[in-house]
Amino acid sequence: MKKRYLFIMLIVLSIASIFIGVKDISLMDIVHWDQDKMQVVFISRLPRLISIIVAGVSLSISGLIMQQLSRNKFVSPTTAGTMDSAKLGVLVSLMLFTTASPLEKMLVAFVFALAGTFLFMQILKRIKFKDAIFIPLVGIMFGNIISSVTTFFAYKYDLIQNINSWLQGDFSMIMKGRYEILYLSIPLVIIAFLYANRFTVAGMGEDFATNLGMNYNRVLNIGLVIVSLISALVVLTVGMIPFLGLIIPNIVSIYRGDNLKNSLPHTALLGAVFVLACDILGRVVIYPYEISIGLTVGVIGSGIFLYLLMRRNAYAA
């Protein structure tokens, strides 16, 4: 799929997103600048749209980086324990720093996400049986252990209601003044683009990268820091969005290959389009109520994930 088609789809869905919601807004309301309707647009609809695009782009690119560095197509922030570690970090910030600002919570979540990701990579190094399906299963089990610890302490300290908002992604609470920290993902995405060629070389293996004169560990650490920071920002602002970083890079690699320089723009655009489409679907299925983005992406993403697994097995046969 060409970039211009993805870009056109993004524009069309973005315009549709502005007009879909409980409060009816028409094109004439915008043309005549209806004060009440425009207030809804600027306080709720526009911040929601921006956060959807930023989250979709950044999480998809995070998944692509993780798959390249781990050399496994089914590794992502969801299947490597990164998102679960970030969630644990948010809980720790609620327990220990009750008056912490969103930035301070994000830093704690980042530290935990980075620690969890590094731990997963260390586990990965020690596993001799590196089957494409086995590795993400290990990551899912690792993430479930962290998630269980999070739930235990949330119940113990009566914070289960607080942490529930981070268990499942939801854009319905995104409003002006409550999402701006997500903008920090933008420079991280830019750095990912600048390091695209290095990530591609690192994906060839440590020996290959070192022979080419590249500092493999430095590139690996930069990639993991980018993934961990983005995961912390998205979990803190929106909540967990499953499968996104897993399925989007796999879909793009089918028609663009594995070179990050070529696939990054397509991954970013398709990620934004996919999340935006799922969000719109969640808003119209049971209108005037809405389904959370975590549930919508989870249902659709799991189906796509199964298709990718079967497609891989078919080609292997």
Residue ranges: model-predicted function:
Residues 1-317:
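Alpha-helical transmembrane segments in inner-membrane proteins
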